[in-house]
Amino acid sequence: METTSTERTAGRRRDPQTDAAAIEAVLDLVSAGATLSGLSLVTIAEHVGVSRNTLYRRWKTKEELYLDVLNAVNRPLPEFGSPTPREDLAAYLAILIERTLDRRAGSVLRALQAEAQAFPELHRRYFDEIIAPRRETVYRILRRGIAAGEIRPGIDIEFVGELLVAPILARMASGAIEKLDPETTGHRIVEHVYRGIQA
């Protein structure tokens, strides 16, 4: 089970319901048009219906809360172990699409991307703690594909990993992600990429 940034802070008594309500509040407010820069812990506390000190006891800064929000929308991945790495790649992409189809999750992810320069430390931790481990999952699947003889040895697995997710990120940026069917699109992307990397 992953430990969030705030759970590592000693001495804080946590109320899971309040924590969940604060995360939901950020998702609601950002999806309604609020910016990450414009929000404050005071505003979020008012939306939840608790005192600001209640939130300050949990998160010293809104950036800490935002990291917990990002952890919440990026749920842990399942174990990938199908007989063919190709199927695992398609399943991974389907999960990524399902996440971005969530309107509120998509709003927060786009907001973070738009305000990355305003929150460099948050953006760095999001990459290090959430994105990088997921990329490594893709790399492991690709290595399995090479070992199984599905994929041609010598490919640049980091570049191929970027090729796999690029169509999804492009659709998310343009607001056209809702037109995608997760399972069908995941398989289509993998089939197209495999034409260039299969053994």
Model-identified regions with their sequence ranges:
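Helix-loop "lid/cap" segments that line or gate small-molecule binding pockets
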Residues: 94-101, 109-118, 191-197
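Short amphipathic alpha-helical segment with a characteristic S/N-K-E followed by hydrophobic residues
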Residues: 22, 61-66, 76, 89, ...
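Basic, helix-initiating cap at the start of DNA-binding domains
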Residues: 1-47, 64
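Amphipathic alpha-helical packing segments from all-alpha helical-bundle domains
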Residues: 102, 107, 111, 121-147, ...
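Hydrophobic/aromatic-rich alpha-helical bundle segments in the mid-to-C-terminal region
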Residues: 3, 124, 128, 132, ...
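Hydrophobic alpha-helical connector segments
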Residues: 77-110
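Short hydrophobic/aromatic patch on the recognition helix
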Residues: 48-59
